[in-house]
């Protein structure tokens, strides 16, 4: 036994069974960057040993504990240290934690930046929701009709706060004011040509009496609605026309023509009694319903959306008055006629197709939807100065109406439609 002690004194304490702290940290603990112990990193299931170095069983060949004497301490101090002694107690735990965090000196370290880390789930969801909201907002901006009433905000007569509701009501009720495009089949003594002659003559009368535009459109509407319900003989067709104009003047005008003037216009073909009796018959047939949306109601609104000038306004009214004479145009609703007239007028003036987003949003008609009606209007423009029904052409050939009838029709629309 004494020999063994002396041998140990000479050779030093055997440290075979003791592993150095850095080496043990390598085998039992992984660096924090390796085990993804970082905020926001994805969770990974690992089996990591959590037993400290003190809990490990002693090695088989580890020497037993002995008291530290002065001689033993001097021997250890003089002996060259081939390997550092394992720290004991709290110092060992401190070094173990440091080595676990920093890792051994020869281990390769990878620097992790914020760009390398995966985005948290909430951040990704916020980005997706934000992009979707932006898309929805852009769609709302694109679909919203531009404000064309800001210039009339201080005009109480413009009723800006109610204008959208008013025109929504017009759009819903315009179908009730329309007549069947085939109503002439129920007439026995008159036809569509006679209707055209009557309206062409009334346009001249309207021009001579200097009546309002809305009066003319309401006159034509009253005539069509009455003829669609009552059979009229040929000799009383003119009487229906002048009486319808009298009713329209009472509804729209401030100063109404007297009955005697209408008798003179008809070359005394009818008496005062005839006109008053026909007036009573018309209002009873129509049940006193005179408040109907005509193409004129939509013309003013759509011209405002088109930011029209005087030239475009006169051209638009020239084209739509040509449509009043044509019986075949009854198949289109008043809003369609108004929008198509403005579209055709823009094409006529500019020489190319012109229909912007503002016009489309306010009229609720696309360029494709207007094309059929616009094509027919171009054909009416082409033959306006020829034939027997030239009242509209003569009216709009004057300087008072900007000589709109002398403009070249937009024949390129006919070619584009044919394609």
Swiss-Prot record:
The keyword Nucleus applies. One of its GO terms (molecular function) is cyclin-dependent protein serine/threonine kinase regulator activity. GO terms for biological process: cell division; G1/S transition of mitotic cell cycle. Keywords: Cell cycle, Cell division, Cyclin, Mitosis, Nucleus. InterPro entries: Cyclin, Cyclin-like_dom, Cyclin-like_sf, Cyclin_A/B-like, Cyclin_C-dom, Cyclin_N, Cyclins_cyclin-box. It comes from the Eukaryota. It is found in: Nucleus. The keyword Protein biosynthesis does not apply. One of its GO terms (cellular component) is nucleus. Interacts with CDKB2-1, MRS2-F and MRS2-G. Belongs to the cyclin family. Cyclin AB subfamily. Involved in the control of the cell cycle at the G2/M (mitosis) transition. May associate to CDKB2-1 and activate CDKB2-1 kinase activity to promote cell division. This is Cyclin-B2-2.
